[in-house]
Amino acid sequence: METITKKARSLYIPYAGPVLLEFPLLNKGSAFSVEERRNFNLSGLLPEVVESIEEQAERAWLQYQGFKTEIDKHIYLRNIQDTNETLFYRLVQNHLEEMMPVIYTPTVGAACERFSEIYRRARGVFISYPNRHNMDDILQNVPNHNIKVIVVTDGERILGLGDQGIGGMGIPIGKLSLYTACGGISPAYTLPVVLDVGTNNQQLLNDPLYMGWRHPRITDDEYYAFVDEFIQAVKQRWPDILLQFEDFAQKNAMPLLTRYRDEICSFNDDIQGTAAVTVGTLIAASRAAGSQLSEQKIVFLGAGSAGCGIAEQIIAQTQREGLSEDAARQNVFMVDRFGLLTDRMPNLLPFQAKLVQKCDNLQHWDTENDVLSLLDVVRNVKPDILIGVSGQTGLFTEEIIREMHKHCPRPIVMPLSNPTSRVEATPQDIIAWTEGNALVATGSPFSPVIWKDKIYPIAQCNNAYIFPGIGLGVIASGASRITDEMLMSASETLAKHSPLVNNGEGLVLPALKDIQVVSRAIAFAVGKMAQQQGVAVKTSAEALQQAIDDNFWKPEYRDYRRTSI
């Protein structure tokens, strides 16, 4: 499949008849013209009327509205995706705000949990550990030769739901749907992959419908050797691929990123994408308040790879704003289930050890507890920003939020855990506990809050603001790596598109209807930074913009011409 440019050329294809109708990337359904029906042996296989894609999308929208539950809507949309991808993306594009929570978080969580139950049709690649020696052959079975973006998971830490085995495939499928819907990357360029290394979820192992390898998860050297076989096979098949690691467990996520980020063009969205969108949100929120991020004190609940990744990017940004590294680190406080991370805490992971507070600096704190709880930290630090990445519901209690508000007139509270069932506090409660003074951004979508007859829109700190633009920028520029500076440029660009900053009112993040505009801007910034960093060939700004335009796929049908195989 070629990328659609401004003037879509005719596409020459060898398929015909029922085979063509079964090819999701090429199928037009009732939109095949009279001439195409004749040339491709489709006469009589479709109803008489030739429809436009908008007419098809209107019918699909009416059918969609007939489903009452979010999971049924998800299944319906996935069925369209698996039969006619162009129609799927036109429908999603027409109703993005309505459908994004259905094709991705929070509904995708339920789809992952019920993957084997609701399975309809194969999509993507499943590589099981018993098949590890056939890795090259498996990737050769992928019919699309021009794959440019892979999202891969091993299913061990799916959202806040834990080990879902091969059910985790729902995440790469959903993520790549957003690469296309938000970032304009052709679906012909994308490939979802799940590494089936077993599961420790006993419920799945006991489920007679479970479709994955029924075996406890492999670990340690066996696990890392298997992942390495996969990476090497991908490099052999698609040397210029962009590989996104998704929903790997904390113990593996950072080691894999560290090992491969300089070997293959790759990033971890849970660590780097979440950090980029969070930092972009915080830059915008700080500017809207007339200050800088470097002036804020920040407390985290959750010191896993995602939380620590956000913290490190905040530290990098505040250094850019003029702080020394030591001063920047003193403004960030990490709390996990064992309390505040300090230099006397044993058994910390390497990425956590860099974010400890020195106990000598805490001697003046007003507390009698040996373990410094979140409430102790909030009471003594008096933070401006509170970020939740714990994956545990209800941990931002009324006492904690009111204590924060006591010392901060306009607190920024970001319960980012997904899905909505795992959020640290609901926006409704946070707004009420702060008398309507908090700026709230969440990880999953929430409806606006009505408090004392005033409406408070809730920004969704969604990685979809970031990763589609990064992907488009990498493809357009031909970047060979994703650097920290490229991620920072994405954060800065997102902040520049904040309605709250630009207009003095509204959401801190752009409306979802504007996400393609934001993705294009991020793609340009990322591509330009890649050139400056020497990981992409330097071109003029005009040439880079043209490459972005040329690679931005639109859900429009093209004219088909018949060719022989």
Curated annotation (Swiss-Prot):
GO terms for cellular component: cytosol. InterPro entries: Aminoacid_DH-like_N_sf, Malic_enzyme_CS, Malic_N_dom, Malic_N_dom_sf, Malic_NAD-bd, Malic_OxRdtase, NAD(P)-bd_dom_sf, NAD_malic_enz_proteobac. Its EC number is 1.1.1.38. NAD(+) binds at R157, D270, N418. The active site is at Y104, K175. GO terms for molecular function: malate dehydrogenase (decarboxylating) (NAD+) activity; metal ion binding; NAD binding; oxaloacetate decarboxylase activity. Keywords: Metal-binding, NAD, Oxidoreductase. Its cofactor is Mg(2+); Mn(2+). Pfam families: malic, Malic_M. Homotetramer. PANTHER family: MALIC ENZYME-RELATED, NAD-DEPENDENT MALIC ENZYME, MITOCHONDRIAL. Belongs to the malic enzymes family. This is NAD-dependent malic enzyme. The lineage of its organism: Bacteria, Pseudomonadati, Pseudomonadota, Gammaproteobacteria, Enterobacterales.
